[in-house]
């Protein structure tokens, strides 16, 4: 099944498309780029064999879903759902923008809105959650603007650059999303973006 979000905002066209075989090398390059790796849990250069195992495992894993983010037809990042739990109606999510050229354009905010709408509207889930390195302040603050609440602080949860690093756990409930949705929708449309799933 392919789920695409393709809209024509005044400024930029953003699409989330399913990962394909043609993305194999691109995703490895992105995962190993310093800009992306700095905020991932892994702290080593990912080799081809390790990456191929991860990539090949995507297709048969019903608890995960991956998309490539495109801006104006150019692949610029990746978004995913993980720990998809249909019984408890919850899942985790993450994304990264590998291309510095799209940072500051509101792309991350658009992806956040898209994912929330997809999880609560399309999937009908009750909870969306994520984990973010405490040092990645701009991302966890973006989540909080969208209504995510801090549910945990995992101290010394991972090792980054040889030192323990703290991780923030955040969650958003479907019942809490309507209180934030209108304001966040207005911010996106003010930037010239069409709302996803509208």
Q: What are the language-model segments listed below?
A:
Residues 35-53:
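Conserved GNAT-fold acetyl-CoA-binding loop/helix
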Residues 24, 35-36, 63-64, 124:
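Generic structural signal for secondary-structure transition and capping sites
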Residues 42, 65-73, 81:
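Short, charge- and proline-biased low-complexity linear segments
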Residues 2-26, 30, 72-198:
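Acyl-donor (CoA/ACP) binding surface of acyl/acetyltransferases
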Residues 27-31, 51, 55:
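Hydrophobic alpha-helical core bundles mediating ligand binding, dimerization, or RNAP-core interactions
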Residues 56-68, 77:
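A short helix-loop-beta-strand connector motif used in the catalytic cores of GNAT acetyltransferases and
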Residues 31, 40, 58-59:
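Hydrophobic residues in alpha-helical segments
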Residues 38-40, 67, 180:
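Short, hydrophobic secondary-structure boundary micro-motifs
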């Amino acid at each position: 099944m392919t789920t695409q979000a393709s809209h024509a905002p005044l400024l930029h066209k953003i699409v989330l498309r399913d990962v394909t075989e043609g993305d194999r090398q691109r995703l490895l390059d992105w995962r190993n780029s310093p800009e992306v790796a700095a905020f991932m849990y892994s702290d080593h250069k990912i080799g081809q064999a390790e990456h191929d195992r991860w990539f090949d495992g995507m297709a048969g894993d019903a608890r995960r879903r991956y998309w490539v983010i495109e801006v104006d037809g150019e692949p610029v990042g990746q978004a995913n759902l993980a720990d998809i739990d249909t019984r408890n109606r919850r899942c985790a999510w993450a994304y990264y923008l590998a291309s510095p050229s799209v940072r500051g354009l509101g792309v991350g905010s658009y992806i956040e809105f898209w994912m929330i709408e997809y999880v609560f509207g399309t999937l009908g889930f009750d909870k969306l959650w994520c984990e973010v390195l405490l040092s990645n302040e701009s991302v966890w603050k973006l989540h909080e603007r969208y209504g995510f609440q801090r549910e945990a602080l995992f101290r010394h949860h991972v090792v980054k650059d040889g030192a323990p690093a703290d991780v923030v756990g955040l969650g958003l409930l479907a019942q809490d999303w309507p209180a934030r949705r209108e304001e966040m929708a207005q911010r996106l449309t003010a930037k010239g973006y069409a709302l996803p799933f509208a």
